[in-house]
UniProtKB/Swiss-Prot annotation:
GO molecular function: NAD(P)HX epimerase activity
Gene that produces this protein: YJEFN3
Lineage: Eukaryota, Metazoa, Chordata, Craniata, Vertebrata
Stated name of the protein: YjeF N-terminal domain-containing protein 3
Key words, A-Z: Lipid transport, Transport
GO CC terms in record: mitochondrion
Signal peptide residue numbers: none
Biological process per Gene Ontology, one example term: membrane raft distribution
Tissue: Expressed in theca cells in ovary and in Leydig cells in testis (at protein level). Also expressed in brain and mammary gland.
Amino acid sequence: MSSAAGPDPSEAPEERHFLRALELQPPLADMGRAELSSNATTSLVQRRKQAWGRQSWLEQIWNAGPVCQSTAEAAALERELLEDYRFGRQQLVELCGHASAVAVTKAFPLPALSRKQRTVLVVCGPEQNGAVGLVCARHLRVFEYEPTIFYPTRSLDLLHRDLTTQCEKMDIPFLSYLPTEVQLINEAYGLVVDAVLGPGVEPGEVGGPCTRALATLKLLSIPLVSLDIPSGWDAETGSDSEDGLRPDVLVSLAAPKRCAGRFSGRHHFVAGRFVPDDVRRKFALRLPGYTGTDCVAAL
């Protein structure tokens, strides 16, 4: 087994982790989609294409009112929370990461999963979305999923370093490189969480390793969950959606961004029930109704 993106697999503990996953775990069973057998991989790809050919709910109500946020509005809302409400940055990242993990459990409930389906590859970038991904991975471990993190371009930011330490202390594996053999990833993991790019972050800003990782993620046939926006998309228009990732699940953080109007995957959640009512009114947000004490709502 070889990889153009890394060292000799015979010397790589990460590759042995993939092999152990293949030896110990049964084939991926139905996750509300076609079974990912040799025949069903094609079936899932076809379903994904069919879903993306439909007009999304958000696109239908695009002109009905301010459901989606522009990048500037999202930044202004965050400033309002940080400066006026005295939220801490780490607090917001924690709230979003926890809610993202809850959204994953809603889309892929643990009792319905086989052991293999519980394995989750979380791919993190060096900006704030990557920090949310690190928190998401930690909470997935608490929820008894089996996350592994690929974090190719590590940020020197103290928050990122602290979150990385927390994951390491909880024995969450980190991959030093991502194999280029797509089928190896398909067979080793039940799903992938995309926390690579966030609103306003271009692929070129995060370095070659992240760009190469996105190219690999585009080829996967296992379910893909994107946090806030699908990596590679223009946050305003979704105009790069043809070249960016096409997730099966989108988890919008706090409120959907404008590009979410182009999302036509299987599940769309709004995660993070922390926006105060007067802030919601100030920014004219029409957020979904949450059930009980849930921090996640399905659209």
